[in-house]
Swiss-Prot record:
Residues 10-278 form the tr-type G domain. Keywords: Cytoplasm, GTP-binding, Nucleotide-binding, Protein biosynthesis. It is found in: Cytoplasm. The keyword Nucleotidyltransferase does not apply. This is Peptide chain release factor 3. GTP binds at residues 19-26, 87-91, 141-144.
Length: 528
């Protein structure tokens, strides 16, 4: 490994932002881009009708609703680091896409609403992070509004997310009484200054806990601050980088993203603490980012990022080696050598051609239907990276076409949208139905809107008698033949040709499990 390679890997930080809906994640994403110099002025998700929409919410449906539906990938620089930021869907109906994004990052930033504490979606996402021991930094947001006491929020995080908190900044007051944050490491008070028209404002800084200026600025709140800091010093968790990197302890920052407050301190610390690109497990071995041969894995496919070009982009995480424009690599699933000629990097929907990229970088490659989620590309060695699954959907709909003459467009649209992984497509063994399965019901609405907008297909849904899906596996051909014969009307193939049992109710599933003990009923399926 040469020095350039090591230097490029070591300065990269690839992370995802996760939160419950409305905790302020997309706003914080904007502010990270603002402080990183990638944008000059932040738009706010709140004023959706204004000309400036949040940079990362670029799809029309996201701008209409003010929620993040797809995953945006953005690159910027800060303090000598190359940062790859993945803004994940915050809405509970998009957790499967969020999960796959978390397989492409080395760390995560968790955003918590100070008024609400830990919420349901946060629990699900933290389960995913725990599975991979992902290091987490926490930003407790909306201190400019009344909320829970910071000790209460941290206790909620520790008890419900099973991770210890180590505050690195500490808030003084909240809501109308919010005065700023104390930086525990530097011994400085950062006075709160509301943002001015989305631009960065620099507030007053007071040095030292015993500085008379502190009492002058805070009044009685200075006494409370000293008491709380003494309590933290005695009973709090000291920061331990090793425990952070193991996913056991989270450094905590407080602020107000909409006011650009507390963001710079968090970002400065984050890039110093967060891990550089990590080794990636493959079926045959673990691949180090410092290896010289190129390898990468596709974790997401987005159709029609530019409606004018009818394009699909495959998002690839580089795992090892160096990418150079036009390089020839092996696409292992189809066994072909391909040239990566037109790779791009992203700033939401803005794309820039990329001449070179390194481990940890996310590049987009044009996909004309040959690339799928989970595909591995490498220079020589046949590799298959693991850990990118499908989850069994919980909601199902039958797709009905209003205009029978558009059957081909419907099929093409459903297949392409299913390739993105946001919805799963099933074709029953009996009949010609299209059954869609999703983790959350809002995804069905998204699919119908995108079919109309991007494929000019008017479709609607009918309910169907399906409550759950399980992928089937057995090493006993006789068991499989018997099962297929007995449950034929309840079986379907998914988009990748894997057999699934679509159970009409939980009791029917229980009965099938009891009747066929040699059959595995799987709730996840590794993307092949």
């Amino acid at each position: 490994m040469n020095r350039e390679h090591q230097r490029e890997v070591d300065k990269r930080r690839t992370f995802g932002i996760i939160s419950h809906p409305d905790a302020g994640k997309t706003t914080l994403t904007e502010k990270l881009l603002l402080f990183g110099g990638a944008i000059q002025m932040a738009g706010t998700v709140k004023s959706r009708k204004a000309a400036r929409h949040a940079t990362s919410d670029w799809m029309a449906m996201e701008q209409e609703r003010g929620i993040s539906v797809t995953t945006s990938v953005m690159k910027f620089h800060h303090n000598g680091y190359e940062i790859n930021l993945l803004d994940t869907p915050g809405h509970q109906d998009f957790s499967e896409d969020t999960y796959r994004v978390l397989t492409a990052v080395d760390s995560a930033l968790l955003v918590i609403d100070s008024a609400k504490g830990v919420e349901a979606q946060t629990l699900k996402l933290m389960d995913v992070c725990r599975m991979r021991s992902t290091p987490i930094v926490t930003f407790i947001n909306k201190l400019d509004r009344d909320g829970l006491h910071p000790l209460e929020v941290m206790d909620d995080i520790e008890s419900r997310l099973n991770i210890q908190c180590s505050p690195l900044t500490w808030p003084i007051g909240m809501g109308a009484d919010f005065k700023g944050t104390w930086d525990i490491r530097t011994g400085r008070l950062h006075m709160f200054t509301p943002a001015n028209d989305g631009r960065i404002a620099s507030g007053r800084i007071i040095e030292g806990l015993d500085n008379p200026e502190l009492d002058e600025a805070l009044g009685e709140q200075a006494v409370t601050l000293r008491d709380e800091l003494a309590l933290l010093a005695e009973a709090g968790n000291p920061f331990d980088k090793e425990r952070y990197l193991k996913g056991e302890l989270t450094p905590v920052f407080f602020g107000s993203a909409i006011n650009n407050f507390g963001v710079r301190e968090m970002l400065d610390t984050f890039v110093d603490l967060a891990p550089a690109p990590q080794p990636r497990p493959a079926t045959t071995r673990t691949v180090s980012p410092y290896e010289e041969d190129f390898s990468g894995v596709v974790f997401k496919i987005q159709a029609n990022m530019d409606k004018n070009h009818r394009d699909r982009i495959a998002f690839m995480r580089i795992c090892s080696g160096k990418f150079t424009r036009g390089m020839k690599v092996r696409h292992h699933r189809i066994g072909k050598e391909v040239a990566l000629a037109n790779a791009t990097i992203f700033m939401a929907q803005d794309r820039t051609g990329v001449e070179e990229a390194w481990p940890g970088d996310i590049i987009g490659i044009h996909n004309h239907g040959t690339i799928k989620i989970g595909d591995t590309f490498s220079l020589r060695e046949p590799l298959k990276f693991v850990g990118i699954p499908n989850f069994a959907p919980e909601h199902f709909r039958r797709v009905v076409l209003r205009d029978p003459m558009k059957a081909k467009q419907l099929q093409k649209g459903l297949e392409q949208l299913a390739e993105e992984g946001a919805v799963q497509l099933f074709r029953p063994l009996l009949g010609n139905d299209y059954i869609l399965g999703a983790v959350g019901v809002l995804q069905f609405e998204v699919i119908v809107a995108r079919l109309k907008d991007e494929y000019n297909v008017n479709a609607l849904y009918e309910g169907c008698n399906i409550t759950t899906a399980r992928w089937l596996h057995t090493d006993d051909p006789k068991t499989m033949a018997e099962f297929r014969d007995y449950y034929r009307s309840e079986l379907a193939m998914d988009a990748e040709g894997c057999l699934a049992y679509l159970a009409p109710n939980p009791w029917r599933l229980e009965s099938a499990v009891e009747r066929y003990p040699k059959m595995e009923f799987r709730t996840t399926r590794e993307i092949s």
